[in-house]
Amino acid sequence: MKREANSRQRSAVSGQLPSLWSADAHVRRRFVLGCWLASVLSCSALDASQLPPPSSAPIDFARDIQPILESACLRCHRAVNPKGRFRLDSRAAALRGSEDRVVILPGRSAESRLIHLVARVDPEKQMPPPGKGEPLTAEQIGKLRAWIDQGVKWDAAATSRQPKIEFSVAPTIRFVSVSGNEAKFREHTGLRPGVSGGAANFSYEQQLDVDTRFSLSGRALPRDEDYAVKLSLDRRDVGFVRAEFEQWRRYYDDTGGTYAPFATPSFRLGRELFMDGGRAAFDVGLTLPDWPRVTLGYEFQFRDGAQSTLHWGDSTQGGVVKNIYPALRFVDEQTHILKLDLEHDWRGTRIEDSARVEFYDLSTRKEQASPGSAFGGTTTPSSFVLVREQASHWQGQNALGLERQLTDWLFGSAGHLYSRMQGDAGFQMNTVTAAGGGAFGEQWFANQILLDRESHLFSAAALAGPWANLSFSAAVQSEWTRQTGLGDENLQVGNPAIPFLFPTPITLNSQLDTHTLTEQFGLRCTGLPHTVVFAEGRFQQEGRGTFEQQVGGAEAFLRRTDADADLRELRAGFHTSPWVGATVSASYKHRETRTDYANLEYVIVPGGHPYPGFLRQRASHGDEVDARLSWRAANWWKMQFGYRLTATDYVTATDALPGFTPGGAVASANHDAHTWSMGHTLTPFRRWTLNASASYTDSRATSAQNGVASVVPWRGGIVSAQGGATFAWTPDTDLRLSHAWSRADYAQNNFVGGLPAGLEYDQHSLQAGLTTRLKRGATMNLQYGFHRYTEPTGGSAYDYTAHSLLGTLSLKWPEKP
């Protein structure tokens, strides 16, 4: 029993790995073993009393079970490349279980993990996963329970009747009409006005032989620049070849800021802004029995296009200057990644090694109206600031991880990650006329910036128990990083056609050393009936050594600062099912951070500024309360309620600065937020399904600058609500209606000292449609959509109203029963 319980806990935490600073999150997700253990302490208890009862009728596999497996399970748990190494294509494979546990216990359906998953009594693990298929009905779960209780009888002939070829395609056509700001609508929805169409999805799968399967799937929506294709050839106990390509487009609004008192309160660039992104990947793998699993691959990622920015340019009207003129940024980004993954189980020890080599290139150009640019109304600015940036680097990293069940009650893991990055960058800023010629203004150059970073990370973790319904976890992680930078800089003010006013170049160099130690502990108790009680703590100590030096220029300086940071985070709570159909959970978290700065060496030339050497301490402390209730009031009514409170105070301490501050600690900021949420799912009448959910967040923030017109306290709320209804009109036709609404009202009237702060908007989306199942495996979907957005803080510059019509015909061969 201890071994089985420990296996359940180990599975609950496997693979939940956080990402750190690395650009390649995949390696770190598979490596960092220190922080995932807390999740096992807060997972909810499984309440078997919530399971639908088993069917009382005798079960026929071909009639009752095979259709359920085909519709909900076999896409992921078939013979080739089964998820979690769990197969449902034969009785022997199903009873063998997954990679770490038995899933089906013949004659004991209430204890079988398969039933817990499909019944969704474990909120941390549900099958089919959300978004991968519809949840099983109580009737289907009852049939599965009866099948298991009756001995898991299997009809091999029924399984062999599965088609060797499966094909599906869903051609679609869409019409969209927009009045108002079309660019804002595109930014919110990703839809372009007019007529568009393509294949919403397509797939082809063929079982070449008993061990080999080929699959092809994707989508193609040409006018949306939305494409995807995946190919896979898998042979059981041999290996696989996989390739995929994906491209998408994201749109941006070309409208800048708004200042109502101006004669022309807002501007638009008058061009379509979008960013194309995509990736291509190719993997080859070996999956030979009793040999290490090897995967060798290549991946290419890219972004290319133009996006709007929130750092707008100047508009001068009536002698008043406001930063509201829209700015844009062109981006050309490419990343090449080589990868090698090894996995192997050796004498009870799981060994994983992931290596990555990355080559990265980035080129950007920003266009923005220059400060003091003379224009008003709809006139083009007289001058622009052009900012060009280039960056490239290579990065190599390797992660080695080990895990082992040391005893019946102790599971351990350890790992090491090494990473090295070297790169260079450049920066140029020019002020030009509207025609592209030189203009008076800032000319700023940093032609060569060299960067180097090296990091080592070690981690170890252990999960012990259970003993007398108690489990304990502990993890420690240590990371050391050194970053160095060296570059030149030349800031010049004037006109490129005449000598510059400040032609003196400068040289900058810096070094940042960081050492971080993190400890995490947790305790979990399941001794109370239907209840889990947990407590956990996370502690972090970090030391940072900073060296910065500027040689030359008007404000040369040298700074050497040590910083000691400390974090403490404590959390405790419970999850209980006091009666059938009800679950209650609550938790409390307290978090404190403090950073002390010691300026060991600080030299400033006369006329220079003391910041940031004038900072001595930063600290924060916050509390969070979370409570949730889930209650099945009746067989046809399930409801959920939630509440969360977060409150954080910030303190800053400084040195004295004559004429400005006497120094010492000051309460620099405060933030409070209350969030209420609720949800209902109802089936009050035959053929009707209703759902509704809503949440409201009320926030308040203040800062040390209270009383100054340009930085005012603010308070406001965000509310969102969704509701829907589905009516089974006929056995083959469903009608659907849904509505989503959100609103924010935390805008501040702050015109006296600056631009408005915050936002006020109102957004509605209504969807109505029908789905009808035609003959020969075809399904038709028709849908109407209504969208409306208003933003009072932007006048009418961002508002729009839109209507959409969508039609999709889904075809499948062979026809599903």
What are these regions (language model features)?
Residues 69, 209-215, 237-241, 290-294, ...:
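Repeated loop/turn-to-beta-strand initiation elements of outer-membrane beta-barrel proteins
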Residues 173-179, 187, 218-224, 235-237, ...:
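Transmembrane beta-strands of outer-membrane beta-barrel pores
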Residues 176, 772, 801-817:
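Outer-membrane beta-barrel "beta-signal"
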Residues 180-186, 226-230, 244-246, 254-260, ...:
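Outer-membrane beta-barrel translocator domains and adjoining extracellular loop/strand segments
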